[in-house]
Amino acid sequence: MQAIADSFSVPNRLVKELQYDNEQNLESDFVTGASQFQRLAPSLTVPPIASPQQFLRAHTDDSRNPDCKIKIAHGTTTLAFRFQGGIIVAVDSRATAGNWVASQTVKKVIEINPFLLGTMAGGAADCQFWETWLGSQCRLHELREKERISVAAASKILSNLVYQYKGAGLSMGTMICGYTRKEGPTIYYVDSDGTRLKGDIFCVGSGQTFAYGVLDSNYKWDLSVEDALYLGKRSILAAAHRDAYSGGSVNLYHVTEDGWIYHGNHDVGELFWKVKEEEGSFNNVIG
């Protein structure tokens, strides 16, 4: 088992480097080639063209070319925020490909391990591939070190890996959410350019503007667990109501020191009428 872990996991030295605050030096080593991170990523063949990103955009960008043959599944609303009771993660479940709804039941939360969650926004395939691969690295780290990987280290591995394919046309905006005793509740935003940001509140996707409106108006650090769960649902509902690319249902998670808890799947249609009756909101809709 140890030999298998050694073959496929991040070297001990690198993981320990990640868990300290020398991230600037680590990033510099990665760019110059001194870091062993460049040997971690799966080998993917890049098309032999000058700019894969521009080529992909020319053949898949529906807004500029409605007749394009390749319609990538995109459009979503995902959010995560910290509060005194941990982290709330809420996502919708609609996937669109061009102007049609490809699915209403997409699972946009990747359960990396019992303490770590990743969200999906952008290209579904990119998010699923990279976050699933990250999960295998987190598990191999546990086998080697006999302890869970930190949220900072997991997000750093992901950002460094996707940075190698910057400009290759990847489409990914994810939040890595977890809880460790050393870090507490922690959220990192990572995108396909290698951007990595730590924060308290993130909304990602085509419906993020509408979700932020509700979230910013009602967010407080000292929210109760019940109020925080409701705020997560309500924010996604606002996005699903106004954004054509968001909808379906709301999947809700609560991340605590003891791990994440799934709080169910809530149909947007049923939730809408319930909220309308309780709040007296959505007065533009008559039912």
Curated annotation (Swiss-Prot):
Q: Where does the UniProt entry say this protein principally localizes?
A: cytoplasm
Q: GO terms for CC?
A: cytosol; nucleus; peroxisome; proteasome complex; proteasome core complex, beta-subunit complex
Q: Where is the active site?
A: T76 (nucleophile)
Q: Which reaction does it catalyse?
A: Cleavage of peptide bonds with very broad specificity
* EC number assigned by the record: 3.4.25.1
Claim: Cytoplasm is one of the keywords in the record: yes
> What is the recorded name of this protein?
Proteasome subunit beta type-5
Kindly give any further remark recorded in the entry. Answer: The side chain of Thr-76 acts as a nucleophile, and the N-terminal amino group acts as a proton acceptor. Present with 8530 molecules/cell in log phase SD medium.
The record's similarity note reads: Belongs to the peptidase T1B family.
According to the record's subunit comment, the protein's assembly and interactions are:
The 26S proteasome consists of a 20S proteasome core and two 19S regulatory subunits. The 20S proteasome core is composed of 28 subunits that are arranged in four stacked rings, resulting in a barrel-shaped structure. The two end rings are each formed by seven alpha subunits, and the two central rings are each formed by seven beta subunits. The catalytic chamber with the active sites is on the inside of the barrel.
Q: Which residues form the propeptide?
A: 1-75
Subcellular compartments:
Cytoplasm; Nucleus
The record describes the protein's role as: The proteasome degrades poly-ubiquitinated proteins in the cytoplasm and in the nucleus. It is essential for the regulated turnover of proteins and for the removal of misfolded proteins. The proteasome is a multicatalytic proteinase complex that is characterized by its ability to cleave peptides with Arg, Phe, Tyr, Leu, and Glu adjacent to the leaving group at neutral or slightly basic pH. It has an ATP-dependent proteolytic activity. This unit is responsible of the chymotrypsin-like activity of the proteasome and is one of the principal target of the proteasome inhibitor bortezomib. This subunit is necessary for chymotryptic activity and degradation of ubiquitinated proteins.
Mind telling me which InterPro entries this protein's record contains?
Ntn_hydrolases_N, Pept_T1A_subB, Proteasome_bsu_CS, Proteasome_sua/b, Proteasome_suB-type
- Keywords associated with the record: Cytoplasm, Hydrolase, Nucleus, Protease, Proteasome, Threonine protease, Zymogen
Root EC class: hydrolase
Q: One GO biological process from the UniProt record?
A: proteasome-mediated ubiquitin-dependent protein catabolic process
The UniProt record gives the binding positions of bortezomib as A124
Q: Does the keyword Protein biosynthesis apply?
A: no
* Molecular function GO terms recorded: endopeptidase activity; threonine-type endopeptidase activity
